[in-house]
From Swiss-Prot:
GO terms for molecular function: serine-type endopeptidase inhibitor activity. Keywords: Disulfide bond, Protease inhibitor, Repeat, Secreted, Serine protease inhibitor. Signal peptide: none annotated. It comes from Vulpes vulpes (Red fox). Residues 6-66, 67-115 form the Kazal-like domain. This inhibitor is composed of two homologous actively inhibiting halves: one which inhibits trypsin, the other which inhibits elastase. This is Double-headed protease inhibitor, submandibular gland. The record marks 26-27 as: Reactive bond 1 for trypsin.
Length: 115
C-alpha cells in the first residue's frame, strides 16, 4: 500500500470558468499548499496548481509558516531565498524574519525560493 497522502484535496470544480480559464476574486484568505507555497485564496490555489506536474493538496487554512522566534539581528550572507507576501525576495530566513518582525507580522511566507 502507498503511504497516505499529506494534506486535503480541494474541490476546484466550482471555480471553473469557460474552457480552462479560472477567474478568481481578489479577497485574501491565504492557504498553504503541500508544495509549501502560500496561495492568496482557495480559487488561486486551484488556478495555480491546475497544470502542475504533481498533485498539490491543501496543508492548512492559513499562510505557510516560517519559525521566526529565534532569529538574530545580525544575519549571514548565505543565499537561501524566500519570497515574502509583499512580493520581495529575502536572501535567507534571518533577513526574512527581521522583515516579519519589523512589519509586526503582516508579512508572511509566500513561497520558498525567489518570487
Amino acid at each position: 500500500d502507498p503511504p497516505p497522502a499529506i494534506g486535503r484535496e480541494v474541490d476546484c470544480s466550482s471555480y471553473k470558468g469557460k474552457g480552462s480559464q479560472i477567474a478568481c476574486p481578489r479577497h485574501l484568505q491565504p492557504i498553504c499548499g503541500t508544495d509549501h507555497n502560500t496561495y492568496s485564496n482557495e480559487c488561486m490555489f486551484c488556478a495555480l496548481t491546475l497544470n502542475k506536474e504533481f498533485e498539490v493538496r491543501k496543508l492548512q487554512d492559513t499562510a505557510c509558516d516560517i519559525e521566526c522566534t529565534e532569529y538574530s539581528d545580525m544575519c549571514t550572507m548565505d543565499y537561501r531565498p524566500l519570497c515574502g507576501s509583499d512580493g520581495k525576495n529575502y536572501s535567507n530566513k534571518c533577513i526574512f524574519c527581521n522583515a516579519v518582525v519589523r512589519s509586526r507580522g503582516t508579512i508572511f511566507l509566500a513561497k520558498h525560493g525567489e518570487c
